Curated annotation (Swiss-Prot):
Keyword terms: ATP-binding, Kinase, Nucleotide biosynthesis, Nucleotide-binding, Transferase
Gene: tmk
Protein name: Thymidylate kinase
CDD domains: TMPK
GO molecular function: ATP binding; dTMP kinase activity
Gene Ontology BP annotations: dTDP biosynthetic process; dTTP biosynthetic process; dUDP biosynthetic process
Lineage of source species: Bacteria, Pseudomonadati, Chlamydiota, Chlamydiia, Chlamydiales
Catalytic activity: dTMP + ATP = dTDP + ADP
Function of the molecule: Phosphorylation of dTMP to form dTDP in both de novo and salvage pathways of dTTP synthesis.
Enzyme class, broadest EC rank: transferase
Organism: Chlamydia caviae (strain ATCC VR-813 / DSM 19441 / 03DC25 / GPIC)
EC numbers: 2.7.4.9
InterPro entries hit by this protein: P-loop_NTPase, Thymidylate_kin-like_dom, Thymidylate_kin_CS, Thymidylate_kinase
Amino acid sequence: MFIVIEGCEGSGKSSLTELLKDRLIAEGKAVVATREPGGSPLGERVRDLILEPSTPSISPYTELFLFLAARAEHITKKIFPALESGNIVICDRFHDSTIVYQGIAEGLGKEYVTSLCHHVVGEKKFLPDLTCLLDIPADEGLRRKQQQKSLDKFEDKPLAYHTKIREGFLSLAEAHPNSYLILDGRQPLEESLNKVMTAYTELALCK
């Protein structure tokens, strides 16, 4: 099973990814947790290049194709082998983040970026079985980030940008209600975890 955790900056998705991994392992499941950008040596280099605030400005198109290249490598080297071996794969961000950030917020076009993402994802096996969206008001998410650490390139963008991100994720969730689980990012993560586990159990019974 392939589970993706999505959300705005500061929503808690990375923490939820770890909690979900730990809960599933405690139940005796074989789990691989990964992230995007990242998940492979190439992906981690792309992550460092794009997110590092000191990196000279690059165009949204360049960012897009770097993300897609990293995803192709990630799928080939990590996600596909893990799924083929019977692991549950949990990914902190996947192609919906690209659609929202580059397609919607950066203005490259939702349909255009979606088409490119689908070419990279390829066979249906690489589409998530479940996408969990931690939804949180953009201003609250940014406040959390500002309290935690120095901001990366995307976290440092203005509130209007992050509002577009939130609206973009919600529009995708509305368009794909059968594969999306919307979670309130303001509630305790343990509550979100329990809801994800319920959704996971229901899906597992259908497989």
